[in-house]
UniProtKB/Swiss-Prot annotation:
Recorded superkingdom: Viruses
Function: RNA-dependent RNA polymerase which is responsible for replication and transcription of virus RNA segments. The transcription of viral mRNAs occurs by a unique mechanism called cap-snatching. 5' methylated caps of cellular mRNAs are cleaved after 10-13 nucleotides by PA. In turn, these short capped RNAs are used as primers by PB1 for transcription of viral mRNAs. During virus replication, PB1 initiates RNA synthesis and copy vRNA into complementary RNA (cRNA) which in turn serves as a template for the production of more vRNAs.
Subunit organization: RNA polymerase is composed of three subunits: PA, PB1 and PB2.
Reaction equation(s) it catalyzes: RNA(n) + a ribonucleoside 5'-triphosphate = RNA(n+1) + diphosphate
EC identifiers of the protein: 2.7.7.48
Domain RdRp catalytic: 285-460
Name of this chain's protein: RNA-directed RNA polymerase catalytic subunit
GO molecular function, one term: nucleotide binding
This protein's record includes keyword Cytoplasm: no
Keywords for the protein's UniProt record, in alphabetical order: Nucleotide-binding, Nucleotidyltransferase, RNA-directed RNA polymerase, Transferase, Viral RNA replication
A single BP term in Gene Ontology: viral RNA genome replication
Family to which the UniProt record says this protein belongs: Belongs to the influenza viruses polymerase PB1 family.
Length: 710
């Protein structure tokens, strides 16, 4: 990073976060994740027996246990096998149409799924580089790895991708060949644009190939490795939670199981997923009934949801469903693979405590000094720790919801239930209060049979029904609002006045439109936002900027200069410059000055660039807001070409270019999959020629353009 990078590319906050870890705005998670991971791993073992006995629990192979062993007071991990089988059977009989749809999906849709879908994920653990990479790049190198070792092309479908992984796992030794710069620190430049004021240099590329080898056992370890991270930007929590990201070797299998679960959940009335915001609210409203003598509404969370879930419980449930559908054995094995892998997962422990002085580092491995996690020492493998029980956050969201839903379909429970992973709301309809309490207790104990624990401190039962909370949406009869939780995030960035104003007003507009804010709240939110907006551009109170404007008798014309805001509820969707001109607040000369492309501070066409805080991955951002002279991005520093992330950045840029040209030439990809014969390049060329030939240009120009397409 050179000296002026902060001035040229990154805002001060980001710079501070890059240079000094552990500082920065509050909800950001910094530093080592080791403690959070160890807590996550030890919890399922502590909760397995009524009296915590980690040493004994470590010998457990599967999480099933007898009903009398279940801790009814505190959280309990594990499940009761017979109950899961019976509940799954019961659920299957009750929702026969949903199961038929699942069978149709397995026979017709599953073989057509493409593995390209996997590139839609976020960060993915790269088993080759042993760190997180963006999903498309991780997928690309995994496919390269498979093709290099199997010496054949891999078909486009997800099933052929999974089959290739199964084949690779059987090889005794696998290798991966890649290319890298042997001396990234030694930068050699060549001049490519000899402009006297600002010459442009390009780095001379050097490449050498390298080979990484895996034995069969090592590859299996990579397949079951989960990279762990702190959950980022969580508001209102003192302790950070961990989330896990698996490698692309297992993502394909997980995707199949999750999509199958989605197919069931879309056709089951009690699920709160996979529907989005407004539909969820409509679902909640339709569940409320007020016609019985006693009604109640129980809303709350499940405590330690991921730690107490067991992969085996999910596997059992799926096996029951698939067996009853009469699916072939290979489908049952396919659905079993991801749960088997998660049964033997290896979690990455992170850095731990590292003492550094100059170039000396001193790492303290687990078990060297006494700690509360000493029971786990026998499970340590290198810098990872194996963990049989429990799950990690962010893995099987839909399957875990399904597991919760099979347990509430009991004849004894009246009323209706909505569940979305660890969040739920249950409406009771009973004759007496005693009956309602009895049902609530039945619900709590039934959920314990599958390994889900209702949190005593976070659940509240309100009778008569009408007040509750689900998915951070609070309702009182019909009123549903959660924008108060969003207000702290409505802060202008301070890099571009036009975009900042448009984004802030957009959030408020959306909240008012969807009924999350009424008009008074909306007006207040607008006032708060305008205040923050002026403060961000030093136009509030007495500052250097306001003094300068006073001394030179400059009248403020726009809100970011200190003028009074012009937007109201009816005009908040309009651009500020256009609105002020329409209202006659800007004269012709001022308007020309603001929108003149030759302004000294008009925005440059270069896309700006920022680093994602979680993993310091560089990313390119484009800005689509209305250009004006107040849209000042200082011209970009060209040293970005020499960053250590250069190779990855180039890959990312090429990837974005290809996807954007495909989006432009094949607009149908937005709705469905575009199919064209030949390679991507040939089909793009053919489509481009077609566009030119059908255009209304004269023949001479058509010929000239067509000759330039190659």
């Amino acid at each position: 990073m050179n000296l002026f990078t902060p001035r040229s590319e990154i805002n001060p906050t980001t710079t501070q976060e890059l240079l000094y870890a552990y500082t920065g705005p509050a909800p950001v998670a910094y530093g080592t994740r080791t403690r959070a991971v160890l807590e996550n791993i030890i919890r399922p073992y502590q909760y397995f027996y009524k009296e915590p006995n980690v040493q004994r629990a470590l010998d457990i192979k599967t999480g099933c246990k007898e009903p009398e062993d279940i801790n009814v007071e505190g959280p309990s991990s594990g499940f009761h096998t017979a109950s899961v089988l019976k509940l799954a059977d019961n659920f299957f009989r009750k929702y026969r149409p949903a199961m038929e749809k699942l069978k149709y999906w397995i026979l017709v849709k599953l073989p057509k799924l493409k593995y390209a879908e996997l590139s839609k994920g976020r960060q993915t653990y790269s088993f080759i580089h042993k760190r997180n990479l963006p999903a498309p790049i991780a997928l690309e190198e995994t496919v390269e790895f498979l093709e290099q070792n199997l010496r054949r092309k891999i078909g486009p479908t997800l099933l052929s991708y999974c089959q290739a992984i199964a084949d690779v796992m059987e090889l005794d030794e696998t290798t991966y060949e890649g290319a890298r710069d042997p001396r990234p620190w030694d930068i050699q430049l060549e001049e490519i644009d000899s402009d006297e004021e600002d010459p442009l240099f390009r780095q001379v590329g050097r490449e050498e190939t390298y080979t990484i080898k895996f034995s069969r056992e090592e590859l299996w370890d990579q397949m079951r490795t989960l990279n762990t991270m702190c959950k980022h930007l969580e508001r209102g929590r003192l302790n950070r939670r961990t989330i896990a990201t698996p490698s692309m070797l297992i993502r394909g299998f997980v995707k199949i199981v999750e999509d199958a679960a989605k197919e069931i959940l879309e056709n089951v009335p009690t699920s709160g997923v996979p529907v989005g915001g407004e539909e969820k609210l409509a679902k909640l409203a339709s569940k409320q009934t007020f016609h019985t003598a006693v009604t109640g509404e129980l809303s709350g969370d499940q405590e330690k949801f991921n730690e107490c879930l067991d992969p085996d419980a999910m596997r059992l449930m799926w096996t029951v469903f698939l067996r009853k559908l009469g699916c072939p054995d290979w489908i049952m094995e396919l659905f079993n693979i991801p749960f088997m892998v998660f049964k033997s997962k290896l979690a990455d422990m992170g850095e731990g405590l590292v003492y550094t002085k100059g170039k000396l580092t001193d790492r303290k491995p687990l078990g060297e000094m006494p700690s509360e996690f000493d029971d786990l020492v026998r499970n340590v493998v290198g810098n990872s720790i194996s963990c049989r029980l429990g799950m990690f956050m962010g893995m099987y969201n839909l399957t875990s919801t399904l597991l919760a839903l099979i347990s509430i379909e009991r004849e004894e429970l009246t009323g209706s239930h909505v569940e979305s992973s660890d969040d739920f709301i249950h409406f009771f309809n009973c004759k007496t209060h005693e009956e309602m309490f009895k049902q609530a207790e039945t619900l709590r104990l039934t959920l314990k049979l599958v390994g889900i624990n209702m949190s005593p401190s976070k659940c509240i039962l309100i009778s008569p029904a009408g007040i509750g909370e689900f998915n951070s949406k609070f309702h009182h009869r019909d009123f549903v609002g959660n924008v108060a939780t969003e207000l702290p995030a409505l802060v202008p960035n301070g890099t571009n006045p036009m975009t900042d104003l448009a984004m802030g007003l957009n959030v408020i507009k959306h909240s008012v439109n969807t009924g999350q804010m009424n008009l008074c709240t909306g007006a207040l939110a607008m006032r708060i936002f305008n205040h923050a907006y002026k403060y961000a551009y030093m136009a509030l109170g007495v500052t250097r900027r306001t003094r300068f404007m006073e001394e030179n008798a400059i009248t403020p014309l726009l809100t970011n200069q200190g003028a009074s805001p012009v937007h109201s509820f009816s005009t908040m969707h309009l651009d500020e410059v256009a609105l002020r001109r329409h209202l006659g607040l800007l004269d012709e000369e001022t308007l020309r000055r603001i929108l003149n492309p030759n302004n000294p501070v008009t925005q440059k066409g270069d896309p700006s660039m920022f680093f994602r805080i979680e993993n310091k991955m560089p990313q390119i951002m484009e800005d689509y807001s209305v250009p004006s002279c107040f849209k000042y991005t200082l011209s970009r520093n060209r040293t970005i070409q020499d960053k250590p992330h250069k190779a990855l950045l180039n890959k990312e840029e090429r990837y974005q270019r290809v996807t954007s040209i495909i989006n432009k030439l094949f607009p149908e990809v937005l709705i469905q999959e575009a199919s064209a014969p030949g390679t991507v390049r040939e089909s793009l060329k053919r489509r481009l020629e077609l566009v030119v030939e059908r255009s209304d240009l004269d023949e001479e120009r058509k010929k000239r353009i067509l000759s330039r397409i190659f």
